[in-house]
Amino acid sequence: MISTAIQQLVNYGLDTGLILPDDEIYIRNQLLMTMQLDSFTEPEGDVCYADLESILKTLVDDAVARGVCDDSPTARDLFDTRLMGVLTPRPSIVRANFEERYETDGPQAATDWFYKFSQDTDYIRRYRIKRDVKWVTKTPYGDLDITINLSKPEKDPKAIAAAKLAPQSAYPKCQLCVENEGYAGRLNHPARENHRIIPLTINDSAWNFQYSPYVYYNEHCIVFNSQHTPMKIERATFRKLLDFVSLFPHYFVGSNADLPIVGGSILSHDHFQGGHYEFAMAKAPIEKKWVFPGFEDVDAGIVHWPMSCIRLTCADDERLVELADQILTAWRGYTDESCFVYAETDGEPHNTITPIARMRDGKFQLDLVLRNNLTTPEHPLGVYHPHAKLHHIKKENIGLIEVMGLAVLPSRLKQELFDLADLLVARAPTAGYPEALQKHAEWAQDILDRHPELNADNVHLILQDEVGHVFAEVLADAGVYKMDTAGRAGFVRFLESVK
């Protein structure tokens, strides 16, 4: 009976604290309105429920059956988000709760509460996050995190076709804009009725804090400008990053680079990503200490990491801003033909930085990863980008998350690796692989040559390990200065140029 499912959702709201007992009748009636129902039958006895996913499925199935909701993945997501929006407190209440916890119990208590809240509202769909495939691969650079992302919805063909016919809207301007809070969504823009953001002030400017709905790592948060303004790495960027870790010292925060190929997927809206997690790069040691003239108070050095990373540590955050700005300015204009580093070609700039900030033992720390987006006929997608032989695993941009040591791999790989495992165990000739697996054929033969012990019991672990090592190669390709004698000598030449 649909009344039971409605009461289950009301009880879920009460159990999670999203609503209070005084809200019960009001919320029930709002849910009835959303479902386009005008009556309710009180269920007999206690109303129990298994989980939120099953409650929402029951309600959406009923709405679909009555023609209230279209039967497509996109339409279903829009509708169940509308239901959860009924349970979600208004922004003013959420912000007051966050601020009270921050002032009374500290920043970690505030973020702990907000992270749970963002899951309870189903903005972060816990039941989908669980589907992601994750493992760790040991490499010479440390333990790399590998994930095949299954929680981010695939593009729905029906929705894509319908979106092309729908009137085009420029509101909100993008998925990061503040105007998303409470937005009902449409076929080509996700619903955000259950989405709440926390305003922040960093570098005396208006920014905001929210969580990523896809949670690639623990407490994966997004910090974004209140204005729809493009990504830009500049002196103010370092100030903003350090201001954020001052507010939330248990979090790291970083920015994607501001140029195509080496930047993230959204260059149009200035934003950072952070969270409560320590990546392999953060754990990587300094392989060569360095002293920048005039900054003897700053501990600096080259990090033992396949991407070219300079680490700066100091108790005085303003000193880090000053030195980071000098390094950025030097790198923007730096050319070293012997290392195939060109600041610009035909007026197009190539050099930028991916910066990451954190607190370490009571001091401020900045990691500055040197990036270059030069392309050539041999490497049309980027010289410092995964090369073609690795595209069967990772072809997409190497953004902030990958830079730090977490591979976010496409969902297609789950089935491809499963199918490939069967072929490897059978020692099937690679020439006969189906079309979808042909891109893996050369890699598969190499795996067989190196793993004569491969069998049905160990094939999946071997494949996971091999994918992890491919990701290590991806990072090496994306590194400007290679981890060899010539590369490290080139890195030192750049450090010497910073004045």
Model-identified regions with their sequence ranges:
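Helical scaffold of the NTase/Pol beta-like nucleotidyltransferase catalytic core
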Residues: 194-198, 226-253
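Active-site microenvironments that recognize anionic phosphate/pyrophosphate groups
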Residues: 1-223, 227-230, 306, 320-324, ...
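Catalytic or ion-translocation cores adjacent to nucleophile or general acid/base/metal-coordination motifs
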Residues: 236, 245-268, 274-335
